[in-house]
From Swiss-Prot:
This is MO25-like protein At2g03410. Disulfide bonds: none annotated. InterPro entries: ARM-like, ARM-type_fold, Mo25. Pfam families: Mo25. Belongs to the Mo25 family. Gene3D superfamilies: Leucine-rich Repeat Variant.
Length: 348
């Protein structure tokens, strides 16, 4: 085989099988209390070398690009004999470089095709407990958590995986994960959370329609009301993107018809940081643009008209944004001309 295997004696399938055997051997040696430490170290060293070789096949190295035929053989063997599960399970026992390599292998395999099929998606659909392991892994210490988020970011690109997480208890964990004290882990968790709520539009729309009350109660309370600056900013931006997506139009109308939701946005508009104010504005304008505003929403907008107009007069992004200025002018004009008489119109 050309490229990577010009001077290699082992074929991809053989390396995969040896890797799987070494993982099993490392586990059995760990269970033997009288096993010699040097023997365990030798097994782990060989395992790390194999993992490095697998990564080189998928990504290439300084001497050669990846060989499609080699990637195909590796992918086929990897999923044929369920190597993904033990590799993920072995990550805590690997050294740092091998952990990085294993993470990259799992991520890369999500994109590999066999006869135009994403075999990783098919595999995960039948082995969803692997996703449970990745989600639970984020609860590990800082260094390990980054490897699990790195793998999961690629897995949630599969619609079947995103749907499973949305409809399982796993989703609830992300309301905490996005607020973890380690910034890099929280950032990764936020990216996964965004993928779950934006990539697969039909799945998201169906989920939000069925779980509206629970989801937005959690979202409002944990992320928009009690979250840190980082959490509030990310959550308000994501919420705006979700509500303004056409596939979520029914959810958007329901959200902007709630007085409680309006109050949350008005509180965010009073945040001392302009970035949060700007994100909140993009959601607030949906309440104002609603042609069928409920009576209580019209009343609170009229009652707070002066404060809102004064706040918006000074609200500007750092860089000139014609679109923002146009939206702001429309919102301010609507609020300025709003009257309690409009309640009757809204009720028709």
């Amino acid at each position: 085989m050309k490229g990577l295997f010009k001077n290699k004696s082992r074929l991809p399938g053989e390396i995969v099988r040896q890797t799987r055997d070494l993982i099993a051997l490392a586990e059995s040696e760990e269970e033997e209390t009288d096993a010699r430490n040097s023997k365990r170290l030798g097994i782990c060293a060989e395992l790390c070398r194999n993992i490095r070789d697998l990564k080189s096949i998928l990504y290439g190295n300084g001497e050669a690009e990846p060989v499609p035929e080699a990637c195909l053989l590796l992918t086929q063997e990897f999923f044929r004999a369920d190597t993904l599960r033990p590799l993920i399970k072995s990550i805590p026992k690997l050294d740092l470089e091998a952990r990085k390599d294993a993470t990259q292998i799992v991520a890369n395999l999500q994109k590999q095709q066999v006869e135009f099929r994403l075999v990783a998606s098919e595999y995960l659909e039948s082995n969803l407990d692997v996703i449970d392991s990745l989600v639970e892994g984020i609860d590990h210490d800082h260094e390990l958590a980054l490897h699990y988020t790195g793998m999961l970011k690629e897995c949630v690109r599969h619609q079947v995986v995103a749907k499973y997480i949305l409809e399982s208890k796993n989703l609830e964990k992300f309301f905490d994960y996005v607020q973890l004290p380690y910034f890099d882990v929280a950032t990764d968790a936020s990216k996964i959370f965004r993928e779950l709520l934006t990539r697969h539009k039909s799945t998201v729309a169906e989920y939000l329609a069925k779980n509206y009350e629970w989801f937005f109660a959690e979202y409002n309370t944990k992320l928009l009301e009690k979250g840190s600056y980082f959490t509030k900013r990310q959550a308000s931006k994501l919420l705006g993107d979700v509500l303004m997506d056409r596939s979520n139009s029914g959810v958007m109308v329901k959200y902007v018809s709630s007085l409680d939701n309006l109050r949350i946005m008005m509180n965010l508009l009073r945040e001392p940081t302009k970035n949060i104010q700007l994100e909140a504005f993009h959601i607030f304008k949906l309440f104002v643009a609603n042609e069928n505003k409920p009576e209580d929403i019209v009343a609170i907008l009229v009652a707070n008209r002066t404060k809102i107009l004064r706040l918006f007069a000074d609200l500007k992004p750092e860089k000139e944004d014609v679109g923002f200025e146009t939206d702001k002018a429309l919102v301010m004009n609507e609020i300025a001309t709003l009257s309690l008489l409009d309640i009757k119109t809204a009720d028709r």
